[in-house]
Amino acid sequence: MLEEINYDTKLFGLIGKNIKYTLSPYIHNFSFTTLGINAVYLVFDLDEMKFNRIINGLLEIAEGLNVTIPYKEEVMKYLDNTDTYSTRIQAVNTIYKKGGYNTDYLAIKNLVRKKIGNMSGYECYVYGAGGAAKAAAFALSELGCSSISIVNRTNLRANELVELLNKNGYNASIKENCNSTSNIVVVNSTPNPSVVPENCIQKSELVIEFVYKPVETELIKNAKKYGIKYIDGLEILVNQAVEAEKIWFNKSVSDEKIIEYLYARKLVW
């Protein structure tokens, strides 16, 4: 964010519910300042009633928006169009001029490619069945995962995600827990880092965690303990933010520079 807000300042922001914890304003306002962009990034913490009342107005006045829980799916009906990935995933987390995108999906693809590359022959277990789970499941499937198993508290959401994946030509099913012995990738898209059993982590080749406060969750601690490769929630948060800025401005600050800033400000630990 530049020091002075004026007539030409562009509005960006995050839409969600119960999101006081978010780091997104720090990330994007730091990027705007670093890149010399005349813009401000705000948080719109909305319950369902407020969301339905003001979403159209926000879409009219904001240059770009991010969307988080619980509106990644609901927001789609208010948009003029969605790109190929978000249409298939049926979830949007980035908006630019009333167009919807999914940078969670892009972040998972980017980060997994760096860690292990091709996913051929891997069995992937995704804990959760919301918007983040959808993005992760599609990204891993497109990277070549041989099967996707959805582990969720309720079968209704899990069934919907399995049907969506299978409709798109992927091999998906519901599991109560991971029961494979090798070549496993585990994703936690729930708010609970302890939902993944330790014996499942031990058998994994890669662990992916969406929770980023603290950065070293119980899941990440266990991955480190057993020498398992991992992608932590901060890496995902920052990379999806960088991908959003590329959509908005066709340029961005590097992941490394943003993470360094967040640690320097003691915003993460």
From Swiss-Prot:
Pfam families, A to Z: Shikimate_DH (PF01488), Shikimate_dh_N (PF08501)
Catalytic residues identified in the record: 72 (proton acceptor)
BP GO annotations: amino acid biosynthetic process; aromatic amino acid family biosynthetic process; chorismate biosynthetic process; shikimate metabolic process
Stored InterPro entries: Aminoacid_DH-like_N_sf (IPR046346), NAD(P)-bd_dom_sf (IPR036291), Shikimate_DH-bd_N (IPR013708), Shikimate_DH_fam (IPR022893), Shikm_DH/Glu-tRNA_Rdtase (IPR006151)
EC number: 1.1.1.25
Domain of life: Archaea
Sites where the protein binds shikimate: 22-24, 68, 93, 104, 212
Residues that coordinate or bind NADP(+): 128-132, 152-157, 210, 233
Catalysis: reaction(s): shikimate + NADP(+) = 3-dehydroshikimate + NADPH + H(+)
Gene Ontology MF terms in the entry: shikimate 3-dehydrogenase (NADP+) activity
Entry keyword set: Amino-acid biosynthesis, Aromatic amino acid biosynthesis, NADP, Oxidoreductase
NADP among keywords: yes
EC category name: oxidoreductase
Positions in coiled-coil regions: none
Pathways per UniProt: Metabolic intermediate biosynthesis; chorismate biosynthesis; chorismate from D-erythrose 4-phosphate and phosphoenolpyruvate: step 4/7
Similarity comment text for this entry: Belongs to the shikimate dehydrogenase family.
Subunit structure and binding partners: Homodimer.
Purpose: Involved in the biosynthesis of the chorismate, which leads to the biosynthesis of aromatic amino acids. Catalyzes the reversible NADPH linked reduction of 3-dehydroshikimate (DHSA) to yield shikimate (SA).
Protein name (database record): Shikimate dehydrogenase (NADP(+))
Organism of derivation: Saccharolobus islandicus (strain Y.G.57.14 / Yellowstone #1) (Sulfolobus islandicus)
Gene name tied to this protein: aroE
